[in-house]
Amino acid sequence: MKNIRNFSIIAHIDHGKSTLADRFIQYCGGLDLREMSTQVLDSMDIEKERGITIKAQTAALNYKARDGQVYQLNLIDTPGHVDFSYEVSRSLSACEGALLVVDASQGVEAQTVANCYTAIDLGVEVVPVLNKIDLPAADPERVEQEIEDIIGIDAVGAVQCSAKSGIGVEDVLEEIVAKIPAPTGDENAPLQAVIVDSWFDNYVGVVMLIRVKNGTIKLKDKVRFMSTKAETQVEQLGVFTPKSVQKQELKAGEVGFLITGVKELGQAKVGDTVTLVANPATEPLPGFQEVQSQVFAGLYPVESHDYEALRDALEKLQLNDASLKFEPEVSQALGFGFRCGFLGLLHLEIVQERLEREFDMDLITTAPTVIYEVVLKSGEKIEVENPSKLPDIGSIETILEPIITATILVPQEYVGNVMTLCNQKRGVQVNMQYMGRQVMLTYDLPMNEVVMDFFDKLKSTSRGYASLDYHFKEFQPSDLIKLDIMVNGEKVDALSLIVHRQSAVHRGRELASKMRELIPRQMFDIAVQAAIGSQIIARENVKALRKNVLAKCYGGDITRKKKLLEKQKAGKRRMKQVGNVEIPQSAFLAILQVSDK
């Protein structure tokens, strides 16, 4: 056991985490050159394209160190994006150490800081590594100083490497052996193994990635999941080198995969503890949480007969992504669809893209919303995540909205812009700290302002230099109202929004004018109105297309022309009574782009 090292890599998006992992695998001979694809551990196409890691993957590598001993290095790959922070904390809790990989030209970013604090809280040894030192812009001294100023760990003489060209990779491996402690645990104690990740395989069902903390797990053992109490039998055990290699048993300190008869991902929850039925552990390992959805959106098929196909597709995605929640929903404007819950906006985009790419679906997505707590005058408390489900204004005592604490790291020259943006979004400044060239701003922001377009605006106002990390803080009472959009006097439920009273009128006007551009002109006038309750706050008209009925009249009496124009008017009026308006997909997307300027 003393020769095992379990570690993961913490890094911001694009700081070279997956490339470094590839180099480790190549160096330790886990795959031969023919099998090396770039980013071996990122197995979903979308992970490679966006350059982000979503699911945790592992590799068990044998490394012959300079002291002549062979060490087993278990690399657990972690996601770096803020939406997947729970997965990160699970991956980290399975390790004794973490490599903090920082781009030597860019320096420290907010998500790195957040994940690093998570690691330190979990008592994991953090080893700083400077990557991309072969770039002309690399400035190792400045970045070492930044790591010390911002994160507060000693970074003098941090290992320098370039994962792309392979310089210094061996030094990093030596550093892992030297600095990261060996796992502790008792092979003979009752089994406690934490599920780091789980995914669905078409042939064997659910594959779980486990880290054995105490005890030993063998083939054919009966095991129990402690949070769901489900029991099942071990059918396969093994490790990934990243190819899967079967083993007879896994002992304390090891990381490997476990396949049982479980067919549903919901039973093998990430962070849960596995124990033996015959000799169970008294209590589970700490840190397990049920995943909470933060952002909700409606997904509707463009063709209504694709409804069942969409249900199948969502169920298949759910097999691999336990944090995706969905339930059927009916909208008057869009027909049958699903209300889905996501971890954050990136998660929403990824799910949408996977549905379109892997399952060939054509979708309409409504504007993302968050959960509100509504206290009724009767004293009852309800949760509302869909604006069209908000009860009548008269029966509401207060509406509480979720507030998040956002940590923003930004270079000094952009601080003013970022603070202005946060104030526009009704943010309250909590803290501001200067660290070298960077400034760390802490704000309490309403979540519904963040889901709209905060991230894009933050990037554009800081020329891409600001980075953001956020976590939920609490529900706070707020002056919120429901904004309805009416087309031709009829409410379109899918376009309703919950907004703050201050920005309602402005938001309504902007939406109405945007809708006017997007709704195709019909044979009759269409009125687009924004309303709060029964009060109309904005109106735009989509002008009718009309034929020139006077084209055939040359000269002659004015009454003839009047008669033709009146006849045309009467026809348009009749049309308007029976006509209905198709609202294009672009109009639903417009809501997302309407900004609070």
Curated annotation (Swiss-Prot):
Where the record annotates domain tr-type G, the positions are 2-184
Q: Could you tell me the Gene Ontology terms of the biological process aspect for this record?
A: positive regulation of translation
The regions listed as transmembrane in this protein's record are none
Bilayer topology term: Peripheral membrane protein
- Main localization (coarse): membrane
Give the top-rank taxon of the lineage listed in the UniProt record for this protein.
Bacteria
Q: Which PROSITE patterns match?
A: G_TR_1, G_TR_2
SMART domains hit by this protein? EFG_C (SM00838)
Q: Which UniProt keywords apply?
A: Cell inner membrane, Cell membrane, GTP-binding, Hydrolase, Membrane, Nucleotide-binding, Protein biosynthesis
Cellular component GO terms, alphabetically? plasma membrane
Q: Which InterPro entries match?
A: EF-4, EFG_III/V, EFG_V-like, EFTu-like_2, G_TR_CS, LepA_C_sf, LepA_CTD, LepA_IV
CDD domains tied to this protein: EF4_II (cd03699), EF4_III (cd16260), LepA (cd01890), lepA_C (cd03709)
Q: Where in the cell is it found?
A: Cell inner membrane
Q: Which residues bind GTP?
A: 14-19, 131-134
Q: What's this protein's family per the entry?
A: Belongs to the TRAFAC class translation factor GTPase superfamily. Classic translation factor GTPase family. LepA subfamily.
Q: What is the protein's known function?
A: Required for accurate and efficient protein synthesis under certain stress conditions. May act as a fidelity factor of the translation reaction, by catalyzing a one-codon backward translocation of tRNAs on improperly translocated ribosomes. Back-translocation proceeds from a post-translocation (POST) complex to a pre-translocation (PRE) complex, thus giving elongation factor G a second chance to translocate the tRNAs correctly. Binds to ribosomes in a GTP-dependent manner.
- The entry's protein name is Elongation factor 4
Q: Which organism is it from?
A: Neisseria meningitidis serogroup B (strain ATCC BAA-335 / MC58)
The top of its lineage is: Bacteria, Pseudomonadati, Pseudomonadota, Betaproteobacteria, Neisseriales
Gene transcribed to yield this protein? lepA
